[in-house]
Amino acid sequence: MSDRNSFDYLNLDNFDESLDSRDYRRRRPERRGGSMSYSGRPSYDRRRSGGRRPNSRRPSSRRRRRRNRRRTRNRIVIVLSFLLVFALLITLIATMINGCGRRSPSVTTSTETKPPQQATVAATAPPARASKEDMLSISNYIEPQPIDDNTDGEETGAIYVWNRNGFELFGGSEDSGVYYADNVNKLAAKIPTVNVYSMIVPNHTEMGLPARLRGKVNSNSQAANIKNAYAAMSSGMVKPINAYNYLSEHCNEYIYFKSDHHWTGLGAYYAYTAFADTLGLPALSLSDCTEAKIPGFTGTLTDLAPGLDTDTVSYWKFPYTVTMDITDSSGTKHTYDSPYFEQEESGSLSYGVFIYGDNPLTVMRSSSDKAQQGKKIAVIKESYGNAFVPYLTYNYEEVHVMDMRTFRTVSTDNFAAYCEKNGITDVLFFNGIMSANNQDLLDSTAALFN
């Protein structure tokens, strides 16, 4: 503590608050030579006052009391301020802890402003898988949740282009689905001794476009079309196969080509597992197979929209042998030791790797130990079925494949007679969504029975 402060606090009785140290130094000579006090009033002279000492301590005591009261007030204010700050700090910490507890650890907060979006899974965890019963129900259709980057595409003629992918637009209605079912019911009635199944496959537009874009493009709901068709099929004669949900579950995988209107071998595999589950059959596992690839596929949509990404065609070689007899459009028969044209090259025809493309009649015979002896299936299909039918060799001893457009050009027997002659036990009407709503192809299917 300084000398001045020592003076202030240790000699309070004689300290005059009206003077600072400079006044004190200036007036010191005057004090020495005269009788005036620091304040200009007469100094106290004990002799002149008759020996009576004035009450000089009373003002000093009042000052001490005032000063003590001020100190007490200041201390109270300091303590209360500290308590208030401490309470606010505790409240802030509690709020932060509660906020962190409510926030999911898997979600990252972003400051980026994005436009509203619908049906996107980019920021949400995938839902739990539905039960097998729900997956196969023909009245239950799980909406696909493809990843949405919130960009727009453009409509080019009959296709929509988005992210360098081509999407074939669907113009069928709910009523046209019912018309397809009526045709299948009539044909099934002509083959009463076999088990009849029907599968309608949605295309890339339904599975690959976010709902935000499906609502903008000139394309109708394929789920509604398929649902109405299946509901109209005769329950006593036709068993529908709901492959829609199996594809929806895998919509963010490479199940459709980018430059072609067909699906990939992987997409066809998921539909095959829906077929196997519906019939209660064991399904082939791709992990038991050997994958082969053909890069550089430029599909049917490339000419309609230049700039689409090229594709890679994948197919899986089975852990068992398959022989395949093909009857071409001239009626000539060819025999192969694989359901795949493994010499197929890159380019616009790479999809032809599956059963050598579209031929009037193809018969595959399997050595799979899961194939039930005597079980034979006939599949009426268009080109969407080419990638699908090889998987059936895992469960069937023989797989007979008829192209609905050309089968009767090489067969003297109609379809019903062919089934009876060849011991067919199961029949599958297989169509992509576009074919199921195409009148010419429906007429071609009906002509198989004439």
Which positions does each model-derived feature cover?
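Extracellular glycan-modifying ectodomains
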Residues: 2-28, 32-450
